[in-house]
C-alpha cells in the first residue's frame, strides 16, 4: 500500500479525523461553516493522496487535483479552484492565490494534538518525509525564528513538531485575511525514496 493511501486511511490526512479539525479551524478563523460546499471541500481536498508515492514530492504535490476536479464537477469551477489552492506550495508554484481553505488547513494541523498526530504519521511512514522536507524548506526561508529552526533540525519528532506548529501558527495569523504569501519558498519537489519494496512514500 502506498504512503498516500495509508495517510488518508489512518495517517496525518485520515479521512475520518482530519476534516473535523479542519472544520474546527474554519470556525475559529471565519465562523461556523454553514455552507454544505465547505463540508464537501473539507472531506474531498486531500482525496488525491490515494495511491500517491510520496506526500510532498513530485507525485504528492499533485494530490490537490482530484478533489479540485470533483468539487468543480459538483459546484463549479470556482469551488474547484478554491479546493486546489488549499496547498500554498501548489498555489505559489502555479501562480495562484492560496485560498481560505489553505489557511484553515494549516490551522487544522496546529490544532491536531501531538499525541494523535505523531503516532499516525509514524504508523504510515510520513513522519520521516515531513521532517526532511521541513528542513529543506526552512533552509531557504527567512521567516523561521532561530528557535523554530533549531527545533526543525532536531532529530526528536516532538521538538520538530513544536517548531513546525509554531511557524505554521504564525503563518496562519499573517495570512488569514489573504494577501501575498512572501513566506512560502517553493523548493523543487523531489521523489522521496524508501526501501519498502518500491511502493514509494
Indicate where each model-derived feature is located.
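Divalent metal-dependent phosphate-bond-processing catalytic cores, especially two-metal-ion Mg2+/Mn2+ enzymes
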Residues: 2-35, 44, 48, 54-55, ...
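An active-site-proximal "capping" alpha-helix that borders the catalytic cofactor pocket
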Residues: 19-27, 61-74
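Transmembrane-helix signature of polytopic, membrane-embedded enzymes
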Residues: 37-39
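Conserved, aromatic- and glycine-enriched, well-ordered alpha/beta core segments
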Residues: 48-53, 64-68
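Short helix/loop segments within enzyme catalytic domains
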Residues: 74-82
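Conserved catalytic core of two-metal-ion nucleotidyltransferases
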Residues: 82-89
Amino acid at each position: 500500500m502506498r504512503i498516500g493511501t495509508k495517510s488518508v486511511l489512518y495517517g496525518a490526512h485520515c479521512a475520518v479525523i482530519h476534516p473535523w479539525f479542519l472544520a474546527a479551524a474554519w470556525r475559529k478563523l471565519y465562523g461556523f461553516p454553514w455552507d454544505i460546499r465547505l463540508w464537501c471541500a473539507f472531506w474531498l481536498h486531500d482525496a488525491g493522496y490515494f495511491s500517491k508515492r510520496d506526500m510532498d514530492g513530485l507525485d504528492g504535490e499533485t494530490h490537490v487535483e482530484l478533489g479540485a476536479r470533483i468539487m468543480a464537477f459538483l459546484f463549479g469551477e470556482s469551488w474547484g479552484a478554491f479546493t486546489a489552492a488549499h496547498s500554498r506550495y501548489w498555489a505559489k508554484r502555479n501562480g495562484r492565490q492560496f485560498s481560505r481553505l489553505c489557511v484553515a488547513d494549516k490551522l487544522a494541523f496546529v490544532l491536531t494534538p501531538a499525541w494523535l498526530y505523531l503516532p499516525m504519521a509514524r504508523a504510515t511512514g510520513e513522519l520521516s518525509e515531513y521532517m526532511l522536507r521541513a528542513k529543506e524548506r526552512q533552509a531557504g526561508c527567512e521567516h523561521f525564528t532561530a528557535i523554530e529552526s533549531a527545533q526543525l533540525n532536531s532529530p526528536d519528532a516532538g521538538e520538530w513538531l513544536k517548531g513546525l506548529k509554531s511557524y505554521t501558527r504564525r503563518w496562519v495569523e499573517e495570512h488569514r485575511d489573504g494577501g501575498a504569501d512572501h513566506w512560502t519558498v517553493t523548493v523543487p519537489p523531489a521523489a522521496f525514496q524508501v526501501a519498502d519494496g518500491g511502493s514509494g512514500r
